[in-house]
Every structure is written in structure tokens, then in C-alpha cells.
């Protein structure tokens, strides 16, 4: 059957996904096919950059909502952005009257990832070109979307380029794209950890608790609901600036909420999104959200558990390395059959000071900032 796409103008995350996939596989043939032979990622970037609302494609029943406003960014909608009933655009007079900070930041992230992958292929000229694209977007975002008064990235009005002071989790996309300075990142982390905004016992609500449209009891979907895709994004975003303790703490709270909801609610399942005030699913228009939603909510018990609870943060098949943060307070823990490239390894920390590693090939294991050489066979590391 022909390809069918519900919303063509959903977030442009293909380049980020391919860069993460390359980290695991080291597959340069795939990169060459994507970037040199077909140029899929570049074409999608350029299409997104020039998109006009109302366009229609045979593969989708929907006209696109995304609208490019020159170099300043994009208008978007709740549905197309993925944040269906978000109150963003409230201060501007509607979705179509605001420039969306996540759209332009995701484009910057794409440019950065394309440049990184071109560099991996040895395409220096292309890497420079995409780095220049990234730097231009970075400059624009910091000039137009950063609000010095609140120390926060906001959507802005098209009419007078003033901040739309609706704090949402979407404002952490600039950090994932490494747009923020150290000082800007510190301010954003303060907002993220503030119990009156995005922190507390149930962190990363989609809308700040201080907002007048925040729905305390259930989150009412994107009016405070906790969504694993944006939670994962925010956690990875602050890690870019070294806030690992804060990232790990957020991850553990969210996973514990998922576990409690799984145990205590009927049916015992993984939910589409969660309440910002209790161990329960969120609601949409008064109805409980969808069950059996591993499509993205499994980011918690899989990705965040491995990366932020166990502490195995990053792999590089091309660089033959694993990066992690191991903590004695967690006791004995580790991972078995971790695969990246052609390497398969077990890494087990006894919780006291010894890491036992088994591998089918040599690689570098970077733990808590220190580099250790792992050989083929068994290796014992004293921390």
C-alpha cells in the first residue's frame, strides 16, 4: 500500500535520529547513502525551512500547518508540533501569530547533526557549510527568542517580536541543540528544577505550574501532562551542559511515577502521558489517555533507565567507546549484552569500587570522566 503520513509537518528530527543511530552502528555506508547519494536529510531540512501553510501531499490527508516566516522562524500549531492543546500562542492572539521556539531549534539541531555526520564521512566542505547554517540559526535564536528578564527561551510574537510568556517544556529544545551559553543554561536548569514551574516530585510537566492554564490534577494532555518524549529531550538537553545529577534525579522520579502507575492502575500498562501531580495517567478532554503506549513512553523504562539510572550515557561505535557514570549508592548494577558496532560487552559494577567487564573486542570505557582500556575477554577495573 502507498505510504500514508498523518501530519507531514511534525517535528524535523530525522537528522538527530540518524546521528544517534550512527553512534550505535558506526555504519558509514548508511550515512553515505543518506547524505551523499540521496541527500534525504538535506532535502528535508530545506523543505522545512521553506514550508508554506496549506501545502498538500498525496501521502497525507492533511494540509500542512507549518509556515516559514523567513529567517525569523516558523508558525506552527499544537497538532503539527505534537503538543496538541498547548496554550502557546495565547499572548500573540493565536498559533499563527507566534514564532515557535522549538521549530527553529529543531532545525538548528538538524544542521548540527548533519555537520557532525558529514565530518564523520570526511566531507570537510559540507561539514563547514552545515556548521555555518547551524551558527546562523544559533545567533538568530539567541537574539530573538531569549528573554533576559525571565532568563528563559520563549515563543515570540510575529507582530512586534515580543516574548509570549507561556513557559512550556518546548523551551528546552535550544539546550539540546547547544544554543544556550553556560549562563543561559544555568537559568534554564533553575526553571526546570523549580517546584513551582517544572520541578518537584513530578518533574517536566509540559506546561509550567505557574501558568494560568496549567491543569494540576491530570495535566489535561499538554496543559501540564508529563510526556516521555519531551521529558527525554529535556534530560538530554541539560546533560549537554554537565547537569548530570539533575538529569539523573529527574529521570528516576519519572520512571518511579511510571512504575507506580503501572502497579496501581488498571489496566497495568504504560500510558501515553502522565499526571503532573500523582501516580496516574493524564487525561484528554476528561478521558483517560491511551494505554499500551510503548511507542514513546517506553523511553522511560528503556532509554532513561539504561542511561540515567544504570548510568550508561553514551556509546560510539566509530570511536569504540562507552561513556558512563557509576554510583556506589546504587549498589551492584550494570548491563549485559550491550551492543555497539561489532562489539558486545557486559559491564557490571559491584557497588564498592570494582567494575567487571567482558567483551568480544577491545574498546575504551570512560567512567566518571576517567578512561580505562578494555581488552578482549575479561577486564577488571578498580575505580
Enumerate the language-model features and the residues they cover.
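Conserved helix-loop functional segments at active or binding sites
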Residues: 20-23, 120, 140-143, 147
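Extended glycan-interaction surfaces of carbohydrate-active proteins
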Residues: 1-5, 53-99, 139-226, 259-287, ...
Amino acid at each position: 500500500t502507498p505510504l500514508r503520513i498523518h501530519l507531514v509537518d511534525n517535528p524535523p528530527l530525522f537528522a538527530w535520529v540518524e546521528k544517534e543511530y550512527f553512534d550505535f552502528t558506526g555504519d558509514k555506508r548508511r550515512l553515505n547513502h543518506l547524505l551523499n547519494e540521496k541527500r534525504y536529510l538535506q532535502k528535508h531540512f530545506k523543505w522545512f525551512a521553506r514550508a508554506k501553510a496549506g501545502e498538500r501531499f498525496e501521502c497525507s490527508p492533511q494540509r500542512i500547518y507549518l509556515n516559514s516566516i523567513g529567517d525569523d522562524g516558523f508558525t506552527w500549531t499544537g497538532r503539527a508540533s505534537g503538543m496538541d492543546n498547548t496554550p502557546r500562542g495565547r499572548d500573540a492572539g493565536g498559533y499563527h501569530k507566534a514564532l515557535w521556539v522549538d521549530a527553529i531549534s529543531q532545525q538548528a539541531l538538524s544542521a548540527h547533526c548533519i555537520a557532525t555526520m558529514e565530518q564523520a564521512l570526511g566531507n570537510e566542505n559540507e561539514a563547514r557549510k552545515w556548521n555555518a547554517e547551524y551558527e546562523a540559526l544559533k545567533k538568530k535564536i539567541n537574539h530573538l527568542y531569549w528573554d533576559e528578564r525571565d532568563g528563559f527561551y520563549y515563543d515570540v510574537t510575529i507582530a512586534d517580536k515580543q516574548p509570549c510568556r507561556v513557559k512550556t517544556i518546548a523551551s528546552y529544545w535550544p539546550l539540546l541543540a547547544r544554543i544556550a551559553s553556560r549562563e543561559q543554561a544555568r537559568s534554564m536548569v533553575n526553571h526546570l528544577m523549580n517546584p513551582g514551574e517544572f520541578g518537584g516530585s513530578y518533574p517536566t510537566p509540559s506546561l509550567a505550574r505557574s501558568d494560568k492554564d496549567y491543569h494540576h490534577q491530570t495535566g489535561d494532555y499538554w496543559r501540564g501532562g508529563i510526556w516521555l518524549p519531551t521529558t527525554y529531550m529535556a534530560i538530554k538537553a541539560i546533560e549537554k551542559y554537565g547537569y548530570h545529577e539533575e538529569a539523573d534525579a529527574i529521570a528516576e522520579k519519572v520512571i518511579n511515577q511510571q512504575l507506580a502507575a503501572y502497579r496501581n492502575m488498571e489496566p497495568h500498562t504504560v500510558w501515553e502521558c502522565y499526571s503532573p501531580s500523582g501516580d496516574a495517567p493524564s487525561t484528554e478532554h476528561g478521558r483517560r489517555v491511551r494505554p499500551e503506549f510503548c511507542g514513546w513512553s517506553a523511553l522511560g523504562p528503556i532509554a532513561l533507565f539504561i542511561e540515567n539510572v544504570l548510568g550508561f550515557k553514551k556509546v560510539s561505535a566509530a570511536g569504540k567507546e562507552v561513556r558512563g557514570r557509576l554510583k556506589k549508592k546504587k549498589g551492584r548494577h550494570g548491563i549485559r549484552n550491550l551492543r555497539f558496532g561489532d562489539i558486545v560487552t557486559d559491564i557490571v559494577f559491584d557497588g564498592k569500587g570494582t567494575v567487571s567487564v567482558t567483551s568480544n573486542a577491545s574498546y575504551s570505557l570512560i567512567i566518571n570522566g576517567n578512561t580505562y582500556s578494555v581488552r578482549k575477554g575479561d577486564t577488571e577495573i578498580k575505580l
